Amino acid sequence: MPKPINVRVTTMDAELEFAIQPNTTGKQLFDQVVKTIGLREVWYFGLHYVDNKGFPTWLKLDKKVSAQEVRKENPLQFKFRAKFYPEDVAEELIQDITQKLFFLQVKEGILSDEIYCPPETAVLLGSYAVQAKFGDYNKEVHKSGYLSSERLIPQRVMDQHKLTRDQWEDRIQVWHAEHRGMLKDNAMLEYLKIAQDLEMYGINYFEIKNKKGTDLWLGVDALGLNIYEKDDKLTPKIGFPWSEIRNISFNDKKFVIKPIDKKAPDFVFYAPRLRINKRILQLCMGNHELYMRRRKPDTIEVQQMKAQAREEKHQKQLERQQLETEKKRRETVEREKEQMMREKEELMLRLQDYEEKTKKAERELSEQIQRALQLEEERKRAQEEAERLEADRMAALRAKEELERQAVDQIKSQEQLAAELAEYTAKIALLEEARRRKEDEVEEWQHRAKEAQDDLVKTKEELHLVMTAPPPPPPPVYEPVSYHVQESLQDEGAEPTGYSAELSSEGIRDDRNEEKRITEAEKNERVQRQLLTLSSELSQARDENKRTHNDIIHNENMRQGRDKYKTLRQIRQGNTKQRIDEFEAL
């Protein structure tokens, strides 16, 4: 029994390990990977590895894994990566898993600066990446520092601005909050829709020379072949759409492209190594096939996948609506609960107030009763004193009468009688005055007793009103509401230093529609506004001395009103011969 070979395949978000047989082909391994991760849009992807000479290479699907120049490690190391890119992510990517893999790969390319991204776009993309990971911003959950361990912005951008890590995070948090209500899958798609407008997005660059020996870059992407000057990867100078190319071939380091226009000369360039031409050929064939496929009616398989994706998306929308409805119901219940708690607290406070008023009234009533009792005792004492004085007065009157009788009946001396009479008269006058004072005092005490009695009656009435008032309604009871292109490539064949491939352009429709495109920022007013705001904010903190060569090129393109698609239209102007002549003249 042959010994199995251990293989590790790293996707953008997982590591997969397999044991394969020595005769396992690249396609069998590839199929095992896509089956494991549930991917059906297999035509974009491939297995990438570093060969035993240290060059990056794509695994050939029609050859045994063990027969290819994979670096001998245990386990063998492969990366599952996008090899080809769609022209328009919103129109072409069907499955969520496909969208996620592209999102993660493009994000890594931007963060590592393999894809140049201007600062304001980097911050906006960072906020979409946060929405894709965390969902809606919630200040109760996403406390300060929740982004501290996240890679969100290219280091180049951070170095160019006088902002701390916290200040970068604050800016991204503000834009994260703006994406409220956006599904995570939709945030990934919005990220890709903006990223695909970046000049270096989806392009494989190769060092080449023209016949004059000028060092240039060849850019191979989903739309065709572009030529760049050596010091500018952002602005292509000449472009050839796939629909203009009928044959591609190479012999050793010489690469020949034959245009459909037979009056035009061959487009010839030279690569530094044979293996570079092999990679260019593979990418040209694969991208051309996808370019043609997109311009023909969808296959039954793709139609079925799109129908299934629409159904799944519709189902997700229904689930989202249900979740939103449930969330709103919960929020309503919470608000009602909070309202009831507030009302309960208010009622409790009112009840406490009633209790305090009742206790105060009872205390006042008790004090008034005590005061009334004291007044009553004083009144009684005054009355008793008045009665005693009245008795004394009456006795004095009787004595006076007696003396008068005695004055008549007895013979006393005039002086003695007069003296006694004067004495008793003075005494009677004093007693009469004392009696009047006591009567006035009795009247005063009777008046004060009457006032106390009136206060007592009033207090009893107030207490009766408080005690008989209906109690505050009890707080309401809270009741919770229940609730991948398959490469049609063969190996290099018997001739290891050359290969030729015919590129058919028959049966396609609207072959240059990409030239009509505009950027996401141009067609989406919200994105345009966000980018302008960010650009204005960042300009105040930018260190102009740290601008890179790409920054200078990008800013100049912006100043002249150029973008990816306007440049594309410009570099494809004129016939094929004119553009090939222009290439040779570089």
From Swiss-Prot:
This is Ezrin. Residues 302-462 form a coiled coil. Pfam families: ERM_C (PF00769), ERM_helical (PF20492), FERM_C (PF09380), FERM_M (PF00373), FERM_N (PF09379). The modification Phosphotyrosine is found at residues 146, 354, 478. The modification N6-acetyllysine is found at residue 60. GO terms for molecular function: actin binding; actin filament binding; ATPase binding; cadherin binding; cell adhesion molecule binding; disordered domain specific binding; identical protein binding; microtubule binding. It comes from Homo sapiens. The keyword Transmembrane does not apply. Disulfide bonds: none annotated. GO terms for cellular component: actin cytoskeleton; actin filament; adherens junction; apical part of cell; apical plasma membrane; basolateral plasma membrane; brush border; cell periphery. Monomer. Homodimer. Interacts with PALS1 and NHERF2. Found in a complex with EZR, PODXL and NHERF2. Interacts with MCC, PLEKHG6, PODXL, SCYL3/PACE1, NHERF1 and TMEM8B. Interacts (when phosphorylated) with FES/FPS. Interacts with dimeric S100P, the interaction may be activating through unmasking of F-actin binding sites. Identified in complexes that contain VIM, EZR, AHNAK, BFSP1, BFSP2, ANK2, PLEC, PRX and spectrin. Detected in a complex composed of at least EZR, AHNAK, PPL and PRX. Interacts with PDPN (via cytoplasmic domain); activates RHOA and promotes epithelial-mesenchymal transition. The gene is EZR.
